[in-house]
Amino acid sequence: MKTVAIIPAGGKGARSGAAAPKQYIKFLGKELIVHTLEVFQQNKAVDEIILAAESNYIGLLEKLKNEYKLTKISKIVEGGEERQDSVYNALKSSEAKADDLVIVHDAARPLLPQHVLTNSIETAKQKGNALVCIKAKDTLIKGSRVVESYLDRDEVYYVQTPQIFLYPVLMKAMKNAYENNFIGTDESILVRRVGEKVNIVDGSVFNFKITTAEDIEMFKRVALRKEE
């Protein structure tokens, strides 16, 4: 069994307010995506990394691969219009076999703890898949500027990445989505649509996705604390 990590890195990063996509901006001396990739480079359970990116950033990623000795990166493929398209392009380019695991992780989640990654891989090896989530702690409402109803937070999770699936299951789910003109916000939605049960694994509050300027400031503070 081989474990292949797919990192879709084609987001525009418009909500962060940055001029360039946030994953290519330097924070604490390294591009954001390097912080993310090093988590996978350093984890012994990960065998290979495939990146999907906009064509005009592929050269930069090749440079970063060499500069930071990211030796597990086997391919850098062109991404698509949607995140789903980028993941699918990377998945099709892989040489994964039926018993191999495919990890999908957001490029803009650089603070993924090693124990969360390792635990999710182990769960996927045992149960066939793993979806990293954190339990909701806040009171949750449904509505549009006016409260319509309250959700039971004991039954609600915030979905994160990594999301891990057996290669043939994820490929089947992707093909099904395209056959039905469906675009999902993550891979677990696609896998559930083909009848698979998805296993929840505990995530971390530090594994947040950097989307806004406030997230960038939070990342800097947490990363600096880790270096102390």
Region roles according to the model:
Residues 26, 111, 150, 164, ...:
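Short aromatic/basic micro-patch
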Residues 158-228:
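Conserved alpha/beta core of the MobA/IspD/sugar-nucleotide pyrophosphorylase nucleotidyltransferase superfamily
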Residues 75, 81-143, 160:
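Conserved beta-loop-beta/alpha segment of the NTase-like Rossmann-fold superfamily
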Residues 1-58:
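N-terminal glycine-rich phosphate-binding loop and ensuing alpha1 helix
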Residues 34-99, 178-180:
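Conserved N-terminal catalytic core of the sugar/cofactor nucleotidyltransferase
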Residues 3, 73-75, 156:
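Short, conserved active-site loop motifs that form the nucleotide-linked donor/cofactor pocket
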Residues 7, 33, 90, 105-106, ...:
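Residue-level signal for inorganic ion chemistry
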Residues 141-165:
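Short, flexible, basic/aromatic active-site loop/helix in glycosyltransferases
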